[in-house]
A protein has these predicted regions:
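N-terminal glycine-/serine-/threonine-rich phosphate-binding loop
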Residues: 1-63, 81
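Short glycine-rich phosphate-binding loop at a beta-alpha junction
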Residues: 60-66, 160-161
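Glycine-rich loop at the start of a catalytic domain that most often binds anionic cofactors/ligands
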Residues: 70-85
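Short active-site-proximal "capping" loops at secondary-structure junctions
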Residues: 68-72, 98-99
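Glycine-rich beta-strand-to-loop/alpha-helix junction loops that act as flexible
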Residues: 65-70, 164-166
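Ligand-binding beta-strand-loop-alpha-helix segment within the catalytic cores
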Residues: 4, 8-27, 85-163
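Boundary/activation segment at the start of structured domains
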Residues: 31, 74-77, 91
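Generic structural signal for well-ordered alpha-helical scaffold segments
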Residues: 44-55, 77, 81, 119-123, ...
């Protein structure tokens, strides 16, 4: 099954943290890290390594990314720029966005406008010659949801990075 039954979710919530690594019921790889800083470095490194490997194979990379946590953006941009990893074949599907009470996008300068935040912190620090093309940045809004769904369905997603709400 592709979803987690609510009763199974509650079972997972009862597993003590020190028993998660290597748990026999895991369906995805799991690692415990020391703190958010280490998680940010790990997220950045894994994504850069994936893009570089797929570039070397001549294959595009498709990822779903959250807006937060913000701790992985600096390591991401530093690694992409230092290694000269081209993001020309990277498609990025943004998993979230904040809307106003009417379901409309927040103003561009609103502190909770995720697109503005991502443009500044995820894309903004990347050298222009390495950048993700605008057409391969899929922003999730009510008006774009169907197009994003269709684009995701076109080919497998290579990596989905999860966020956590500490920011």
């Amino acid at each position: 099954s592709d979803h987690v039954d609510p009763s199974r979710l509650l079972e997972w919530c009862r597993v003590p943290a020190d028993q998660l690594v290597g748990h026999p019921g895991l369906r995805v790889p799991f690692r415990m890290v020391e703190d958010a800083r280490e998680m940010g470095r790990l997220m950045a490194q894994e994504l850069v390594d994936l893009v570089a490997a797929r570039n070397a194979e001549g294959r595009p990379t498709r990822v779903i990314v959250p807006c937060g946590p913000s701790g992985w953006y600096a390591p991401w941009t530093e690694r992409v720029n230092a290694r000269g990893v081209s993001l020309a074949r990277l498609s990025v599907f943004h998993m979230d966005e904040c809307l106003d009470w009417q379901g409309l996008p927040l103003p561009k300068e609103h502190p909770y406008n995720f697109r503005t935040f991502m443009e500044r912190h995820f894309y903004g620090g990347i050298r222009p010659d390495l950048a993700v093309p605008e057409a391969q940045r899929f922003w999730l809004l009510p008006a774009t949801m169907e197009r994003v769904r269709e684009a995701i369905a076109e080919a497998p997603v290579d990596l989905t990075l999860g966020g956590w709400g500490q920011d």
